[in-house]
Structure formats: C-alpha cells, structure tokens
Amino acid sequence: MDVLTRFNSGKLWDFKGGVHPPERKSQSNQKPIRHAKLVEHFYIPVVQHAGEAGNILVKVGDYVFKGQPLTQGDGLRVLPVHASTSGFIRAIAPYASAHPSGLATLCLHLEADGKDQWREQQPLDDFLTQTPEKLIEKLYQAGVAGLGGAVFPTAAKLHSAEKQVKLLIINGAECEPYITCDDRLMRDYADEIIEGTRILRYILRPEKVVIAVEDNKPEAVAALRQVLQGANDIEIRVIPTKYPSGAAKQLIQILTGMEVPSGQRSSSIGVLMQNVATAFAVKRAIMDDEPLIERVVTLTGDKVRHKGNYWVRLGTPIYQLLQQVDYHYDDRFPVFMGGPMMGFILPDLQAPVTKMTNCLLAPDHFEYAPPAPEQSCIRCSACSDACPVSLMPQQLYWFARSEDHEKSEEYALKDCIECGLCAYVCPSHIPLIQYFRQEKAKIWEIQQKAKQAEEAKQRFEARQARLAREEQERKARAQKAMEARRQEMKTAQGIDPVQAALERLKAKKTDNDSSAKVEIKTIVTEKGDILPDNSDIMAQRKARRLARQQQTQNTDVSQVETNEENKSTDSKSAVAAAIARAKAKKAAQQGSALEKDEISSSDTLSVGNDTEPVAEDPRKAAIAAAIARAKAKKAAQQGSAVEKDEISSSNTLSVGNDTEPVADDPRKVAIAAAIARAKAKKAAQQGSAVEQDEISSSDTLSIGNEAEPVADDPRKAAIAAAIARAKAKKAAQQRSAVEQDEISSSDTLSVGNETESVAEDPRKAAIAAAIARAKAKKAAQQRSAVEQDEISSSDTLSVGNETESVAEDPRKAAIAAAIARAKAKKAAKANNHDA
C-alpha cells in the first residue's frame, strides 16, 4: 500500500514512545503578534542556515536599503542574507553567536538610520504566470529557509524533490512546550499561509496537500478552515497532542503509518514537509518581493513581564529584545533559545536573533531548577522506551563517551532527532542529548575531512588528466606541424627530407662497417690469460719521460755555465780597473823627478813579444784610466767587499816569459800597487773632461795578442792561483808597515829578469793579472783546507814557457778560466773527501 492510499484512508497512526510534558502555551498565545521596536545596531550573521556562507557584497561604510542582499552564494545550498533595515555598514567582524558553543561568528554590523527604507520591490500579482524554476530561484534569492528549526534552504529542498512528491504536508503541530509562534501565525495570518501553501503546491505538483495541526490549537484550525471556505485543494487534519508529534518523521508516521527509511529523506517515499512559518515566508517572498529579514519569536517565561509573540528583525541583539518586554536579568536563571525540550542555554545574551530563533524562554525559580548531578547509568531502559526513533540511547551514550565513532554510526546515531526525550526521562539525570550532539559534531568533522580529501584527490586526478591531455594535444600539434614542414620541403626540393636522412645514415653505417678494424695486440700470460699488449704505449711514455729529463739537465748545465761566465767577466772588469788605476796614478806623477825615473825604468820591463809601447803617450794612460774608472764603478756596485784584495794581489802575478818568480820579493808587489794607485789618482784629476769620450772609445780597444790559452794545463792554473793567494796574503800583512818605503823606492826595483820592457804594453800585463786574480779568488774559496800543501809545492813548478801573447784571443782566455775553475772545484771536493 502506497503513501496516498494510507493517507486517503483517513486513519491516524501512532509512533513509538513520546511523552506529554506540561505545555505552558497559554502564557504567550493570548495576544496577537506584535512588532518589536527597531534597535539602533544590528549584527547580521553571514551564515543563518544549514550550509556555508556566501560571498560578502558590501564593505565598511556602504549604505544599504532594507531588504538589500549583503551576501551572494554560488548554489542553492548557500543562502544570501539581507539588510534588516536601511543604514550603514559599520564593521565586518566576528561577533557572539546564538550557538551552544558560544563561539564568535562573522557578522555584518549594520547601524540603522531610522528611515527603514525598502529597496526597490517588484510584487507579483499572480504566481501562476511564473514557471516553477523561476519561483524556486526567487525563493533562493530571498533567502528563505525552513523556520521549523532545521533552517534547511527551502529552494534546495524543493528543487531536489521536484516531481517526486505525492503528498505535501504543512506542519502546524508545534508540539514543543512554551512555543506558540506557529499557533499565533496560523491565527493571525491564515490567509497568507494558505497562499504560500498553494505556491508550494504549484511548484511541487503533489496529488495531496494537508495542513496538520495538534488538537490543542482549535483557534488556529478554525482560522484556516475559514480561509479555505470549503476548498478541497488543501486538507486540514487535526492530530493528537503528543511530544514529539511535530517532528517530520513522526508526523509522517502519524498521517500515513509509514516510516522514513534510515538514512533517507522523506521524499524517498513521496512525501515532503514544510513548516507553516515557511509557507508564510514563501508567500511574502513570491508575492510581495520581501526577503526573509524577520520572523515571529515567542518571548515567554516568568522572568518576562510582557509575554507574547513578536515580529523581530534578524540581527537584533537578544538582550535588547528582552529589555523591550521588561525582562529582569538574573544570573541564577539562564535564557533558553528554543523550548525546554530541544532548546539550549544561551552563553551570551548579546547574540543576535537568527532564522532559527523561534522562542526565547526566560524562566524563574518556579520553572527552572539547576540540573541535578549526573549519575551512573543504571541500564533501566527508560530512554529506549521513550525514544520515538527506536534507538538505544544508553548504548550510544557509551559509544559517545569512548569516542567510538564507528559504533555510533553502526547504531544509527544520525537518525536521532534530538528531541530530548531520553534526557527528560533519565532517572540518573544524564544529559544524553548533549553527548549525542557532540558525537554528531565529531563524526561530521571527520566526514568533512574525508570529503575534502576526496575532493582534493579528484582535483589532482583531474589536473593530471588535463596535463596528459594537453601534452598529447601538444605532441599532436607538433607532429602535424612537422608533417606540414616535411611536405613543404618535399614539394619545394622534390626529395623527402626524412627519406634522405635515412639514406645518409644507412650510407654512413655502411662506410663504418667497410672500414678496417683496428687490430688489438694481445699477450698470453703464463696462466693462459689473454691480456692487451701495452708495450708500445709504455715505450712511448718512457721515451717522453727521458726526453723531459734530458731537457731539464741541459737547462741546468747551460744555467751554470752562464753564471760562471758572468762571474768571470765581472772579475776581469774589476782586475782591469784596478791595474788601470795603478797605472794612471803612476802616469800622473810623471812631472816630478821620481816620475821620470819610474818612466825610464819602466821601459826596461817586457810583458811578452809585444811591440807597441803603452806609456809613450800620456793621453793613452788617461784614456785607460777613464776606462778603468767606469769599469771600477760598476765593479764597486757588485763586489766592493773584494776590491781591496783584488788590487793588492794584482801586481804579484807573472805576466810574460819571466825566468824567475815575480813574487820572490813581496816588496816589489807592494811597490807596484802603490805606483798604480798614484797613477790612478792623478789620472782621475786630469781625465774628468774627456771621460765621456774615453768611455765611448773603450769598446774599440784590443785586449792583446795572447798566443795560447793560459789553461793549456789546468794544474798550472791552479798552482798559479795558489801562489798568487799566498803572496797576496803575505803582502797584505806587510803593506801597512812598508807602504811609504815601497813608494819611495819604487823607481829602483825591477820586477824580474825580463827580456822585454813591461811598459811596452801595460794593458797586456793588466789582462794577465786579472785572469790570475779571478783564478786565485775561486781557488781560495774552494781549497782553504789544502792551502799550505799547494804553497809548499808551488816553488818546484814552472808557470810556463809561453812564447806567444796571452791576449791574442780573449775568448779563449775566458774559456780556459772557466775550465780551470771547474777543475779546481772538482779537485777541492776530492781533497776534502780524502781529508
């Protein structure tokens, strides 16, 4: 049997459980509905329904008219809110909310200007001229929600049940004690309720429409029947008074005897229910173009002097509303929103009135007693017996306390209508309804998180699919463009570029295959292993390494020879300068008597086989002195520390074909040195004017005609150096005592039994002396340990039987000197090891 058959039978059914609490409705239903005074400040929450908040359309400082939308949603479940009066938006901020938690919610602070000026309205004379879809959209824009307590968006409810409804029920039962807003609304505005009911019938097109009213409201029933005047399109049925007969599922069961399946809506069995206050709001929204900005609120309780029902603008602070009815605040007695069974205590009286505010109850000590202390459950099953939904509240209580959400869902906690009967009958005074509400909130939060995660997953998958699709489209476009370019090239050149590239690749591969493969040499080890033969590579590496080592050795030898040549050149320059200074000093003394004897005696000295006289022209001596000074200055910068030793030893060397040793008499050496110094001093005084010319011409002079290198026998050079060092040392010790005597007697001394005059060419003698000094200096540094042996053996050796001039080739002399130095160093090292 379907729902219509059961309804048409005219029978009323009963539901399980239920109670008959004291009604106390007469306190507030005796007077018609009055209008509450407008307050100065309204706090309009952006969420006043079962859903989410819309987008705010205004900003601080904006002026708004009465009925102007303040928010706008993007779906039928996101209802807009409207300005309760005209004025200015002063703030958009959190404010106290009418909720058991007392949490703040976002509100629009509207300051009224007192004009209460409507926005432009467009009333509708006949709703039959509009389509149901347009009427649903208009209800949505008006912000109409269920005013029976659930505040579910009416437009969404109608849209979801369209063309599925067989029975439309207008709920006028109002079973909650103390609440009389629906009763007075049916009495005072029955015609508008009937008009709203007909609009709903036009939208839903049900087969039957019924207005259900409890039998404790005879005045309301009479008012409705009077408006209908015998019309049969809407039926009125009076039901027995029993709590909670006004609940949707219980009222359906009373009228049809059918229960709504668990977890489903009433539309699943072809039934839709709306509250009488909602029908009234539908009529105002469709016909009068008035959004939902006010509702009827019951103000009752012994703490309220002027009890009754009032039209209250949404957003009115509750405390200011209670003050209008002469409410006496007492912190011992709370104020309830809703009735004593399903209502809750307001944590803050500054909270505003919203769409769900149907009653404000302010009891005194006769009506309210503090809740008794909670005791342990005694498993009496009174709650189960009273539950109109046939649940097991005691089991749900344990699940809620242990937060066993799965068990709570398994025991159908979601079917609980929160009527409060279980707590009302509990002998242990357990606030079961509070536990169930908290458990529902936790489960809802978990489900929301899961829903958000699923939505995020779907968005991610959709994004991945979109990216993959875009990638495929991009590849397809690239392939298409490539094919187009290929076709263009083929058309222009007559050759397919892809085919040509493949042919080139094939030809290249053929060439590589036909080329000779590199033979890899291998060797076989004793164990029979085959390894690559790297002997050629190793030989090449060894050759490169030896070449680098040889290059390094050649560089070192050339560097040593260069250093030795530089030292030899510097020593020769210093020796030549010293001899020149001595001769210049002697030449400067030519004007005196001693000078003449020195000159005459100097003619008897012979240096070698030279034939050119040096002292015949004193200008030559001056030139030589200038050259000597230039060289001496340079030598002084490089070796000032050894200058004196070089000068003192310069006159002790044998220059020519001497038959006797030059230094048999050390006095002769000292005399020669003194003469050289005197001549150098005089030449320095006379030759300053011609110094530059002398220096410029110094490079053109010849060193001599030496016949053979001094170092034909390197041992002779070493012996000569040793003799020179010994004589120089001895002469240095005697110079200080006999210097004056040596100078005075210098004219009468003979240097040796020489066969030719020494003064014929003094430059040759200077060269020979410089060579000897350089050798002596080198040998002195290397052979200090064997100096005495060399001196003792020097007397038995002959220096030379030289028949040719030493200075014929100065380069040969330098080479001989370098060789002599190297051999002397080697001999010194050998002697040191022997010692």
From Swiss-Prot:
Binds 2 [4Fe-4S] clusters per subunit. Residues 468-492, 540-574, 586-618, 634-666, 682-714, 730-762, 778-811 are annotated as: Disordered. GO terms for molecular function: 4 iron, 4 sulfur cluster binding; electron transfer activity; metal ion binding. Pfam families: Complex1_51K, Fer4_7, RnfC_N. Its cofactor is [4Fe-4S] cluster. One of its GO terms (biological process) is electron transport chain. InterPro entries: 4Fe4S_Fe-S-bd, 4Fe4S_Fe_S_CS, Ion_transpt_RnfC/RsxC, Nuo51_FMN-bd, Nuo51_FMN-bd_sf, RnfC_N. It comes from the Bacteria. GO terms for cellular component: plasma membrane. The keyword Repeat applies. Gene3D superfamilies: 3.30.70.20, NADH-ubiquinone oxidoreductase 51kDa subunit. PROSITE patterns: 4FE4S_FER_1, 4FE4S_FER_2. Residues 468-489 have a biased composition (Basic and acidic residues). Residues 552-561, 648-657, 745-756, 793-804 have a biased composition (Polar residues). Its EC number is 7.-.-.-. It is found in: Cell inner membrane. It is a peripheral membrane protein. Keywords: 4Fe-4S, Cell inner membrane, Cell membrane, Electron transport, Iron, Iron-sulfur, Membrane, Metal-binding, Repeat, Translocase, Transport. [4Fe-4S] cluster 2 binds at residues 387, 416, 419, 422. HAMAP family: RsxC_RnfC. Part of a membrane-bound complex that couples electron transfer with translocation of ions across the membrane. Belongs to the 4Fe4S bacterial-type ferredoxin family. RnfC subfamily. PANTHER family: ION-TRANSLOCATING OXIDOREDUCTASE COMPLEX SUBUNIT C. The complex is composed of six subunits: RnfA, RnfB, RnfC, RnfD, RnfE and RnfG. This is Ion-translocating oxidoreductase complex subunit C. It comes from Pasteurella multocida (strain Pm70). The lineage of its organism: Bacteria, Pseudomonadati, Pseudomonadota, Gammaproteobacteria, Pasteurellales. The gene is rnfC.
